[in-house]
Design a protein with these regions (language model features):
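Short, structured motif recognition centered on aromatic/hydrophobic residues
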Residues: 9, 63-66, 71-76, 96, ...
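Core segments of cupin and vicinal oxygen chelate
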Residues: 15-71, 108, 115, 128-133
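Short beta-strand-to-loop junctions in surface cap/lid or active-site-entrance loops
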Residues: 77-83
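Short consensus segments that form the blades of beta-propeller domains
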Residues: 89-91
Length: 175
């Protein structure tokens, strides 16, 4: 049995090197909306270490919540901390990750990213076999180096034909 009362994924938290630059990227390039800011947060005791697993002298300059259409919210953190690593993990590293955005028109979305100077990794790949047949995907890199992805499967994926559970699907129209 899983978490009692689980309703879904609420948000994804990301630490960025420059909150304002990351916000411009998420708002102007991706299309998210700023909802609210909080912070700064600093503690003279071990609260940061106990509650967030970071150096106890860490300072969160600001935390910003973004809404991205009808998916989970994005929580951006900007820390001021002495032991911060400037390079995130690769996808192949333990803890590696990427953030994926569903788009209705893959070609238009890729052209939009490239038009904003975003590094797109290769060309979109359409899966033609297996349970994920029907998905079109491509990775891209945020200005601070984080790997992100575009996906599109307007006709669904092959696994859905006989599945007891269907993965997240975009709403007919996102706001």
């Amino acid at each position: 049995m899983g978490l009692p009362g689980l309703a879904g994924a609420d948000h994804v938290g990301l630490t960025v090197p420059d909150l304002e630059a990351a916000t411009r990227f998420f708002v102007e390039v991706i299309g998210c909306k700023v909802v609210f800011d909080v912070g700064p947060f600093i503690s003279d005791d071990d609260w940061m270490e106990k509650h967030l697993g970071v150096d106890p002298r860490s300072k969160i300059n600001k935390l910003r919540m973004l809404k991205c259409a009808n998916g989970p919210s994005i929580e951006l953190f900007e820390y001021d901390v002495k032991d911060q690593k400037a390079v995130g993990p690769k996808n192949s590293d333990i803890g590696g990750h990427h953030l994926s955005f569903y788009v209705a028109d893959m070609n238009a979305a890729v052209a939009h990213l490239r038009g904003h100077g975003v590094q797109v990794l290769g060309e979109p790949t359409l899966m033609n076999e297996g349970p994920s047949a029907g998905i079109n995907w491509v990775y891209f890199t945020a200005p601070w180096g984080m790997t992100m992805e575009l996906v599109s499967y307007p006709r669904g994926m092959a696994y859905e034909a006989n599945a007891k559970e269907i993965l997240w699907r975009p709403a007919a129209s996102a706001s």
